[in-house]
Each structure stands twice: as C-alpha cells, then as structure tokens.
C-alpha cells in the first residue's frame, strides 16, 4: 500500500519536474533566439546605414549602383568578399531566424522525447548547417553581383536596360510564388522533424539535416531573396518586407502556407509591373 501511495505521489511530482524543465528550456531557447535576432538585426541596420551614407554610383538609365559590389579605396577583392559574406551571414540570421526558430524548437522537442542528451548541441548544429548553406549562396550572389556590376560599368547600353531588367526579375519572382515547385519547397520547410522521416540523433545527422533544411529553405526563398538582391541589398525596408513575407508564409497555419505565398505573389507581380512601367516611362 505504501509503495502504491509513493508511486501515486511520485507521478505528479515527476510531471511537475518535467513541466518545469520544459518551461525553463522553452524560455531559455527562445530568449537566446531573441537576443541573437536583436543583435543581428542591429548589426544589419548599422551596415545598411553606413552603406547608404556612402551613396552609390550613378549609372546610365537613371539608377544607382550599390557600393556593396565595388571595392572601397584601399580594399582588396578578398577583403571586399570577406566583408560582404560577413554581413550577408549576419543579415541572413536576422531575416531567417524568425521562421527558423520554431523549426529548431520542434526538432529539440522531438529529440527530447527519444534521446534526452545533447539537445542544445544538436539543435545548434542544425542551425549551423542551415546558415552554412546560406553562406554558400551569399558567395555565389557576390560573384554574380560583382560580374554584373563590372559589365554594367563597361557597357553603357547594358546599364540602360537594368531598370527594366529589375522589373522583369521581380515579375518572375512573383510568378514563382504560384508554382507547384514553390509549394513543394514550402512543404519541406514546414515539415515537422520526426514526422514521416528519421529523426537526426547524432552530430553528423544533425549537421546533414541542417544542410538539407537550408537547401529547401533557400529554394523556397529563391524568388524573395532575388528581389532583395536586385531591388536593394542594403535597403532596410526591402529587407523588412522580404523577412515578413518569408516568415508569414512559413509560419501560416497548416494547409494555408501556399495560399499565403500566392497572396504575396500577387503583391510582388504588381510591384514588378509598376517597376517596368516606371522604367519605360509609363509611371
């Protein structure tokens, strides 16, 4: 009888301890994510402000080239690339963390049910793999941006069509929001860890899961990220709009993510048409 009473009293006590541990982990995790977001957002804002203060290079066609694609006085190209990649990574943390944090928390929760050890380390490795993919995309974006900037400076005829080209790129990015490919990639980004797939339980598997998640996310955000690059990589308002779009479509209730993506697509298509209209003198 005493054993039964002890067991009965132990269950509520054990449940209380588990709930306390869960709450502590929940608030610690999200508190650290909030601090990381605030720090990266502040650094990004400061970088954008400093780049805006430098101005840009006026180009044929009535547009201005960002100094992000050009070396400052005394800078070497490796230095320019390192500076761009550093700020790109910080910017990606600020932009992607609001939609990534819930996925990392669900992964940590699923891990706690079956493993119970190294939860934070494995979650960090998933995040590291995720942002490693975004760093690689940043390197590719820098190479393409520098090449296009050099061509635009050497070929005035090409520079004159850049405003129309930007509008067409934005229009294409908006159209991408309506495709089945977008829906599939968005579904992969919203997939709950451990549901229908093997849960990554070791260091290598966690890293690979982060890489896979980063790939799906970068594919899903391809159109929106391209808008950021062509419209204004140092424009705080463009950055905020792209971040909001990514977060809303990723965190929408189950079954509504693609619908939200299409609504965003309508807005982007409208903006693309407006940019083209202004470029050809219709607006």
What are these model-derived regions, one by one?
Residues 2-89, 113-114, 152-160, 179-200, ...:
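Histidine-/acidic- and/or cysteine-rich, low-complexity loops and terminal segments associated
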Residues 245-270:
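Interfacial loop-to-transmembrane junctions
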Residues 108-113, 223-235, 244-250:
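Interfacial segments of multi-pass membrane proteins
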Residues 140-142, 216, 220, 271-283:
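Hydrophobic alpha-helical transmembrane segments in multi-pass integral membrane proteins
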Residues 135-150, 163-191:
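Transmembrane alpha-helix/helix-exit interface in multi-pass inner-membrane proteins
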Residues 3, 8-10, 14, 84-131:
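Juxtamembrane transmembrane-helix termini in multi-pass membrane transport proteins
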Residues 174-184, 205, 209-233:
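Alpha-helical transmembrane segments of helical membrane proteins, especially in multi-pass transport
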Residues 34-38, 82-89, 93, 124, ...:
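Hydrophobic, lipid-facing residues on alpha-helical transmembrane segments of integral membrane proteins
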């Amino acid at each position: 009888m005493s054993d039964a009473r002890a067991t009965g009293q132990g269950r509520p006590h054990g449940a209380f301890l588990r709930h306390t541990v869960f709450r502590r982990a929940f608030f610690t995790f999200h508190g650290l994510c909030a601090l990381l977001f605030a720090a990266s957002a502040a650094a990004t804002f400061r970088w954008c402000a400093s780049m805006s203060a430098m101005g840009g290079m006026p180009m044929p066609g009535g547009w201005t080239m960002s100094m992000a694609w050009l070396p400052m006085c005394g800078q070497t190209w490796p230095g320019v690339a390192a500076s761009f990649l550093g700020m790109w990574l910080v910017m990606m943390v600020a932009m992607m963390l609001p939609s990534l944090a819930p996925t990392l928390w669900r992964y940590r929760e699923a891990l706690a049910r079956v493993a119970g050890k190294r939860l934070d380390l494995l979650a960090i490795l998933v995040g590291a793999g995720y942002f490693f993919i975004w760093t690689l995309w940043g390197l590719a974006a820098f190479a393409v941006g520098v090449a296009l900037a050099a061509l635009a400076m050497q070929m005035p005829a090409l520079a004159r069509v850049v405003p129309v080209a930007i509008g067409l790129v934005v229009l294409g990015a908006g159209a991408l929001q309506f495709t089945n490919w977008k829906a599939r990639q968005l579904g992969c980004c919203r997939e709950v860890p451990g549901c229908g797939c093997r849960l990554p339980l070791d260091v290598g598997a966690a890293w690979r899961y982060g890489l896979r998640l980063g790939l799906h996310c970068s594919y899903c955000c391809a159109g929106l990220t391209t808008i950021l690059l062509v419209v204004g990589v140092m424009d705080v308002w463009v950055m905020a709009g792209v971040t909001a779009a990514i977060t809303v479509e990723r965190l929408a209730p189950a079954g509504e993510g693609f619908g939200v993506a299409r609504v965003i697509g309508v807005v982007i298509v409208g903006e693309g048409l407006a940019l083209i209209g202004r470029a050809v003198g219709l607006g």
